[in-house]
């Protein structure tokens, strides 16, 4: 094969995120320049731009052979046909304010984004016609820096598009495709970027274009801005911009699925489109409702987006002149009938304009149905549920894949949502599964120490910071992981309720424990920042003996290391505020045991043999103390003894039995394949039938 064709093929692979969940492709890029691969944090685009070793590799027969193998896998995947493509001729358009696809594409903040990313990946794997739309955030989300006093500083993270897997969408003249929407009476332009997620397309809107005024260029600048006016403009551009973009691209949407209320104005944009065609207001709403799905993630009414009525009125004054509709009709869509004073509520608008609504776990359905019941007094509450799932090929460790290929069969990835497949996990020898797990723990600790070393070299950081960030971690020690957004209701510091008792647990000379924390607080979340500071200062405290670590700037790369490398995944939000949670699913699929309060998905996932649970009790008085006490008791009486109980080979046989049960029970039930099939069967098939 000609060298230029190999280069073209490598660039094609680098610009399609298919490589991120296919280990042979990862290994292909790593083999080009292993040191640079590590330095670039596994970014193939940056690797190909910077490496000086590629020319030699192109003369290496083994490398060329490896490339041909990977490229053939890729082409076979991209060209395969699915039953869904035959059944559904129009796509579902999926809108989300964030997407967690890979750490080289920093347009995510947390779990909501990774759920969206996993839906795109799974739609590609299943061959289901789905298109994603979101924002290209030039500044992404905050970069976290922890000061010596433990306080989180929020640094701007400038996205370097030339190093990201994004390309400009071009118009018929070969120029960057730009569209515009009206925000109030002003044109706001946006350029369009494209991301290839396997066979699925993701389009990203970017208002940072020269046609815009400085204040309008800021609309898509970063995720989750606190300023209400800017946030509303984001919502308007995402909703109305999506409809305009689809028209420009000639895409006839079969239906719309919004991930939280942020993109809710897409429903209104569709209504206006039908008004132009001559439909009445009520008939337009009726037609849009038929093809609309709203997924709610919020278990608290105070956490939804609300705006003063005058802001909405200013945006939609034109409806009187253009459509003969009183602007009050628009305002009524988002008005709480029990408390109009709260302003325009975009979640309420979403609930009114979507025929199909789902919560993200069975427990969350119960909470949401009760929370919004006042909207459905005269009719049946429409809130169904689809419990979240995670993309198995993305989150599973490559070592574990090799074990599965040997003992479950080469096509285990295609069959991973089949429960019967996982009965075969009993055939994996305990010592082999344990060897895999220990390797991953060693890699996690090495990665954490590399991050600390990098900060030492680049910043000459205070040694106490490096100690707190994990320099003393030990792969022989029982390791607990806690990694997620740092905010009050998730109670990250709950385990420090009884500091002296925790010191005894972690410093036990024969059976020590270490705890690794990671996660960012929202820039405006002062309580979350105080929690981080508290944990970080405990990590610096010599009395904890280096057994507590807080790793700064949690990202998707660190998440991969953590959900594979710790022994226990701790989860202790204040119930019922965990809508679902997904990090514990990722951990369980990798044989990491889940220790969690009974909330969110764990109510459905826990079977008494695949982890530990607490919180199924009524508490009078201090809930935090009761839950902390439960965690200490489980650690002291169950987790620690089980982990350190070894046979003559040094293998914790009973622990591994629980690992196998976790993998067997969680993988088929909480994978994104099961989730997407649920969406198809419950909602998408009905929406596309309505449209058809």
Curated annotation (Swiss-Prot):
- Tell me which SUPFAM superfamilies the record gives: UDP-Glycosyltransferase/glycogen phosphorylase (SSF53756)
Q: What is its EC number?
A: 2.4.1.1
**Residues that bear N6-(pyridoxal phosphate)lysine:** 586
Supply the Pfam families for this chain. DUF3417, Phosphorylase
Q: Do you know which PROSITE patterns this protein is assigned to? A: PHOSPHORYLASE (PS00102)
According to its UniProt entry, the function of this protein is described as: Phosphorylase is an important allosteric enzyme in carbohydrate metabolism. Enzymes from different sources differ in their regulatory mechanisms and in their natural substrates. However, all known phosphorylases share catalytic and structural properties.
| Entry's family note | Belongs to the glycogen phosphorylase family.
Know the name of this protein? Glycogen phosphorylase
Name the species this protein comes from. Answer: Aquifex aeolicus (strain VF5)
Q: What is the lineage of its organism?
A: Bacteria, Pseudomonadati, Aquificota, Aquificia, Aquificales
Q: Give me the gene this protein comes from.
A: glgP
